[in-house]
Regions:
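Glycine-rich beta-strand-centered segment in the early N-terminal region that forms part
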Residues: 16-32, 45-92, 126, 131-134
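Glycine-rich cofactor phosphate-binding loops and adjacent beta1-alpha1 units
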Residues: 156, 186, 194-254
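Cytochrome P450 core scaffold surrounding the K-helix E-X-X-R motif
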Residues: 37-39
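Short Gly/Pro-enriched turn/cap motifs at secondary-structure boundaries
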Residues: 5, 16-17, 51-56, 108-112, ...
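NAD(P)H dinucleotide-binding glycine-rich loop of Rossmann-like/cofactor-binding domains
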Residues: 87-165, 191
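Mid-domain Rossmann-like dinucleotide-binding core that forms the NAD(H)/NADP(H) cofactor-binding site
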Residues: 79, 132-213
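C-terminal hydrophobic helical "lid"/dimerization subdomain
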Residues: 261-293
Length: 293
């Protein structure tokens, strides 16, 4: 499915079979999720998309061919491909395990071809081995919100009492993983967002409330899934405005990346640690559009 014009429906096209270059793998796509970022690409809300482009970055598939120098993968192995598709490896961010802030990144489904296709080529450094179990459709969202949440959770340490500020896609996955790890999770939502608070409790939150409230006990760690914008030290002084490279990574250090692979068994290896069932609508290739406007 090809985006040929910004804001227009994707077009079903027959394209040449992509060939993996050095350090790349070709993957036969089993499933690819639809993320809000795909809508941003289609609607032109992310700048300078190199049209035509194949969107899609929540990809689950089988390794089909290996480029020169690739090790650690074999044909037929199931892998996941996320949004962050390539980094330079040499800038200061890459050298300090913050490759999601790379000075010269490439993004799957935006600046390199994505997963709304039968085959996709990926940088092998940013392809994650998956287990044999698990529905590809259920696993696909873990390649975006799941990775953002996982990296944030790793950085938060091993504290027993964990706070989640903002309860959206990434946080609801982190909730399930953290509960599976035996942690007590405290969820904070926008003031008055009773639905989000009820959802958090249904996933095992020991407490849920407004972001302006104090939790009933001190927290060992907290993850803040906040939108890009200003930070305040106190009511009369502002930090400079923050302009994140891609605001979909609400928590700093999101987007996954090779320095924080999802290595915990059951997280991206085919198991579902949580008890909330995924309810992802399924569309055959070419049958649906990510939507515009």
């Amino acid at each position: 499915m090809l985006l040929e014009q910004i804001g227009q429906p994707l077009q079903l096209r027959e394209l040449p079979m992509p060939q993996p270059g050095p350090g790349e793998v070709r993957v036969r796509v089993l499933a690819c999720g639809v993320c809000r970022t795909d809508l941003h690409v289609v609607d032109g809300e992310l700048p300078e998309a190199p049209l035509p482009i194949i969107p899609g970055h929540e990809i689950v598939g089988l390794v089909d061919a290996l480029g020169e120098g690739v090790t650690g993968f074999e044909p037929g192995q199931r892998v996941g491909i996320p949004w962050l598709g390539h980094t330079c490896g040499t800038c200061s961010y890459c050298q300090h395990a913050e490759e999601n802030l790379c000075d010269a990144p490439q993004f799957t489904g935006y600046t390199r071809p994505g997963g709304y296709a039968e085959y996709v080529v990926a940088d092998a450094r940013f392809a994650f081995a998956l287990g044999e179990e698990g529905d590809p459709v259920a696993l696909a969202p873990l390649l975006c919100a799941g990775l953002i949440g996982w990296r944030s959770l790793v950085k938060a340490g091993d504290g027993k009492r964990l706070g989640l500020y903002g309860f959206g896609a990434a946080a609801h996955i982190v909730m399930q993983v953290a509960r599976w790890q035996g942690r007590d999770v405290y969820a904070f939502s926008r003031p008055g967002d009773v639905a989000a608070q009820d959802f958090a409790r249904s996933l095992g939150a020991v407490w849920a409330g407004d972001s302006g409230e104090l939790p009933p006990v001190p927290l060992d760690a907290a993850i803040i899934y906040a939108p890009a914008g200003g930070l305040r030290r106190h009511p009369h002084e502002r930090y400079p405005e923050l302009s994140l490279r891609h605001p979909l990574a609400g928590a700093r250090g999101g987007l996954g990346g090779q320095s924080h692979p999802p290595g915990r068994p059951g997280v991206l290896s085919g198991g579902r640690p949580g008890r909330y069932p995924y309810r992802n609508p399924r569309l055959p290739a070419g049958a649906g559009q990510p939507g515009t406007g």
